[in-house]
Amino acid sequence: MSSKYPRSVRGCLPLWALTLEAALILLFFFFTHYDASLEDQKGLVATYQVGQDLTVMAALGLGFLTSNLRRHSWSSVAFNLFMLALGVQWAILLDGFLSQFPPGKVVIKLLSIRLATMSAMSSLISVGAVLGKVNLVQLVVMVLVELTAFGTMRMVINNIFKTDYHVNIMHIHVFAAYFGLTVAWCLPKPPPEGTEDKEQIANSPSLSAMLGALFLWIFWPSFNSALLTNPIERKNAVFNTYYALAVSTVTAISVSSLAHPQGKINMTYMHNAVLAGGVAVGTSCHLISSPWLAMVLGLVAGLISIGGAKCLPDWLPDPLQHWGTQLGHGDSSHVWFPDRFAPKSQNMESTSCG
């Protein structure tokens, strides 16, 4: 469906975005250069492969998870890709400027792109709370402000607590969830004309959203291990993330079916609950030395995710109740925070388990 903004506004919004892109090109021209060091070819290929996994998670996983709004069922994927492309550029510059004193030219490495992609995912998580309620320029401002705040927060945490990149980036779930809630809460009320139609859920949202969840599920071990440099820690992170995801998936599907009077699986809850284990072990995945610990975390995460989805929506005020199902998609900290729990909807799809 076409935009309901006036023609004059529709013409200005893309021009603002193009102007910003031109400014970014100038910043890259004056303040960046490629790393000239010779890297080991084997290590270079491995680094690039991890970067590919992260891009698939961001572009396809989070993109399809936003496709359950009727007017944004497919355009949400384009908005997601737009924010990702813009966010990666800004995050590379921001991380470079914040990490060196005095500021100089930013050296771009594959690690820089990998870290920037993970940082940009914070805005893709938060946008679930406002998709359908903001225009293109507002999305651009949201990306720039959020990534600046997230990068500054990581720098402060690193300087005070002396943590590494892995621990810093794992705060993305908490930060993005509450940033998205804050933006949604600050948007003007009542919404502009036509917003109610934009907010309506599509009749069959589960297929594309579940496809996004599958992309995230498959590549989540890469996300949790992307910034670890010690081979043993990376191996532990991959193993523990996989076991936690597997157990949380079995738990979520079983409990969802058990809680339904007719034994059906609520697919809307599944989009996020199957990923609960990956979020739960994110910060400590490289420290867990035995698979049973990760499996217990996955079990608890699945129980909390489904239990919260079933019980908490009635207690949440607007706009948290309506937008809780959108906020953070599959990558948010739905294990711990009530803003992740989905509201009841007549359009929720269920699948019989027996």
Swiss-Prot record:
Give GO MF terms, alphabetically.
ammonium channel activity
SUPFAM superfamilies documented for this protein: Ammonium transporter (SSF111352)
What membrane topology term does the record carry?
Multi-pass membrane protein
Disulfide bond sites:
none
GO biological process annotations for this chain's record?
Answer: ammonium homeostasis
Q: Name one Pfam family in it.
A: Ammonium_transp
Q: Which UniProt keywords apply?
A: Membrane, Transmembrane, Transmembrane helix
Q: Which InterPro entries match?
A: Ammonium/urea_transptr, NH4_transpt_AmtB-like_dom, RhesusRHD
Q: Which intervals of the chain form a coiled coil?
A: none
Describe the family membership recorded for this protein in Swiss-Prot or TrEMBL: Belongs to the ammonium transporter (TC 2.A.49) family. Rh subfamily.
What is the documented function of this protein?
Answer: May be part of an oligomeric complex which is likely to have a transport or channel function in the erythrocyte membrane.
Stored PANTHER family: AMMONIUM TRANSPORTER, BLOOD GROUP RH(CE) POLYPEPTIDE-RELATED
By what name is this protein known?
RH-like protein
